[in-house]
Amino acid sequence: MQPTVAIILVNWNSFEVTNDCIISLKEIQYAAHTIVMVDNGSTDGSGKQLKQLHPEIVLIESATNQGFTGGNNLGFEYSIKQGFDYSLLLNNDTFVEPDFLNHLVNYMEAHPKVGIVQPRIHFNHDRSLLWNGGSYYSKWLGFLYTKGFNRKTSAKYLQFKEVDWITGCAFLTKNSILRKTGLLAPNMFIYSEDVDLSFRIKALGYQLMYHPHSVIYHIAGMSNKSKTKGKEGFVNPIVHYLNQRNRIWLLKKYTPWYCVPTATLCNIFYISLIMGYFAVRRRFTKLKAVISAVKDGLSGHIAPAFGEFSEKK
């Protein structure tokens, strides 16, 4: 008997994108799976429309947008409560190869020391280009980075690799592990929550693995770009706020004491460059967002005042 997998998708006003993802998932070879779609406070009726079109999926409805973390946590909670063996978190703006889940489950079953595994991820617009070929962390610099971004697939990306953190675009983990670590940090809302969970899993002694033979394709950018350009560009100031605030939270939580001086200096320099760029380009709403992110990141303030960073189109 195959281990059971709950495939967790979060939909927010994205009927076409989520529908394409579900259609792709219907072609997978792994039989013992259930698609669990969390409708994250959609205002366009897309959640109910998708359930009507795909009655076999499980629909969980949230009255409000709980962010990437809160939405996926609703799916994790359902998966754990229903007794699934595994949870697969999958961004709704993805397409999958039919055998992608077979590879991930079989690898986890054969390697009990592995706590979480991710597929090889390509861009969807050009499937010859990688989006993520493994993710790493420099504790001395306090920087997160991925390998292979926007590069052609080569031999080094076709090898199994232990990585420092797993992208939240797609990963498989055991529910028994989630019971120990806890779920995604809800106060992070979105961005770097995958890093935080990865570090918690690693702290339990598990390995984090990149699987080169499990392949998916990512549209990318759905969560951080608006469809129309505002006065300060396509990227909402909230994105910059959350990215920098959560970056500082991670640094405070996970930087070893002996790396604090170098990591602090590098991140002061990096954030100063961002602020300088916004000042020169006269993107003052975004500049204000980054300043607030630094204050809240250092103080530990949790509730972001999103309204402060809204910009007029």
Task: Label the predicted regions.
Residues 256-313:
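Non-catalytic, C-terminal membrane-associated alpha-helical segments of glycosyltransferases
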Residues 19, 44-52:
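Acidic helix N-cap motif at the loop->helix transition within catalytic regions
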